[in-house]
Amino acid sequence: MGLLAYLLVILLILNVFFAAVTVFLERRDTSATWAWLLVLTFVPIFGFIIYLIFGRKLSGKKIFDWKGQEKIGIQESTANQIEMIRQKEFPFSDPNVKKHRDLIYLLLVNDGAILTQDNEVELFIDGHEKFDALIADIEKAKDHIHLIYYIFHSDELGNRLMRVLERKAAEGLNVKIIYDAMGSRTTKKSFFRTFEKNGGLVRPFFPSKLPLINFRLNYRNHRKLAIIDGDVGYIGGFNIGDEYLGRSKKFGYWRDTHLRVHGKAVYAMQTRFIMDWNSASSTHKIDYKARYFPTFHGKGHTSMQIVSSGPDSEWQQIKNGYIKMINAAKKTIYLQSPYFIPDASLLEAIKIAALSGVDVRVMIPNKPDHAFVYRATTNYAGELMETGAKIFIYDNGFIHAKTLVVDGEIASVGTANMDFRSFRLNFEVNAFIYEKKMVQKLEDAFLEDILKSYQLTPELYAKRSLWIKFKEAVSRLLSPIL
């Protein structure tokens, strides 16, 4: 037997071993298990390499350090809120917030997401307005600027923002940037050179430790947060790049949703940034000092919780929040996501709502961002139509918003898509909102988007070609690992 034959046998044995690990040792969703078995079975030579890069679960090693949070009373505040809500003694700001006590309690217990009720919130659905506001706030910063973005491109918008950050760092402000190593893979390190020379600090999240191979490639930090002086925070779907200003020929106008927050909810955003920074950086760790958590004298009336989720937890906090919202629906469910690949639990919740007479409307893009993901999205949308849910195809560019609005009373806005990746593989962050005026603005934006969309009817869906149907079937089969 030649050397090549020996190598082939070794590879096949490794393939069987990884298949066994997938089935018997790693705790994962059944659908994902079967999807990986298909890959390992039908790609026997390279299947285990693909699995090593994309399939392995994160180790049990602690990724985020909660040490030091007692200095600002986070655990104490969380425990107090849990107990007061359990004892029905919590001073809710208005009846609508109190009405959704069960959802608030779930997110408190599941994620430690403290409810804050004094927030002033501004809604952005256009990238130009969002980045103009963000840069204006950065220009006014006096102490620190903390940014975390999945994508930070070195294009016109990226350079415009970077020049401001370089100047603020040179002024002596504490300026820190986290970018995702995969999402920002085309951005060269030299882009940050002047920023670092001026005193700014930048860290990639989960960079490759080996040339060409990153064994944590599948686990990405998809969060988008900006915190200025601990006083103002931004959360939502916009990354940093020209395409988010509608400058891409492929996508055209970019429709997204982002929030500017002034109030105690910024504390939660700050805490999230500190934990992510201390995970990404081996030096210049951030301590929980008072400078990062200034005293607020809130004038706002928006109640909200900032909820994080990621592969470091088995609880899928944001998805559980979505399901709780959907199960509570009595009249309407309006949902926007560029990728609609729900797992069985979320899909069943939406189906039950539609079959119960709730007006369910789901909005998806009219063009693919990722080909396989898009075909899986249209397949799930087609299945949902069978329950009476209405599917709308956004036809005015590209819809990237991740928004869920229920009964005009509660809403969620953030970075988490309605897909397996956001629920199980990505590090995400969402705002759950309970104030009717803010929720109404989100509902109005959705209804305005419907005027720029067309409805996908069963008749139109049935006209798909045999090739499209085949691509949908394959994409859905692989959807748990896309």
UniProtKB/Swiss-Prot annotation:
Biological role stated in the UniProt entry: Catalyzes the reversible phosphatidyl group transfer from one phosphatidylglycerol molecule to another to form cardiolipin (CL) (diphosphatidylglycerol) and glycerol.
Gene: cls
GO CC list: plasma membrane
Transmembrane segments: 4-24, 34-54
SMART domains: PLDc
Family assignment from sequence similarity: Belongs to the phospholipase D family. Cardiolipin synthase subfamily.
EC code: 2.7.8.-
All copies of domain PLD phosphodiesterase, residue ranges: 217-244, 395-422
CDD domains for this protein: PLDc_CLS_1, PLDc_CLS_2
Organism: Listeria innocua serovar 6a (strain ATCC BAA-680 / CLIP 11262)
Catalytic activity: 2 a 1,2-diacyl-sn-glycero-3-phospho-(1'-sn-glycerol) = a cardiolipin + glycerol
Subcellular location(s) of the protein: Cell membrane
The protein's name: Cardiolipin synthase
Pfam families, per the entry: PLDc_2, PLDc_N
Domain of life the protein comes from: Bacteria
Membrane disposition: Multi-pass membrane protein
Main location: membrane
Keywords per UniProt: Cell membrane, Lipid biosynthesis, Lipid metabolism, Membrane, Phospholipid biosynthesis, Phospholipid metabolism, Repeat, Transferase, Transmembrane, Transmembrane helix
Record-annotated active site: 222, 224, 229, 400, 402, 407
InterPro entries, A to Z: Cardiolipin_synth_Firmi (IPR030874), Cardiolipin_synthase (IPR022924), CLS_N (IPR027379), PLD-like_dom (IPR025202), PLipase_D/transphosphatidylase (IPR001736)
Keyword DNA-binding found: no
Gene3D superfamilies (alphabetical): Endonuclease Chain A (3.30.870.10)
Top-level EC class as recorded in UniProt: transferase
Record has Nucleus as a keyword: no
Gene Ontology BP annotations: cardiolipin biosynthetic process
Entry GO MF terms: cardiolipin synthase activity
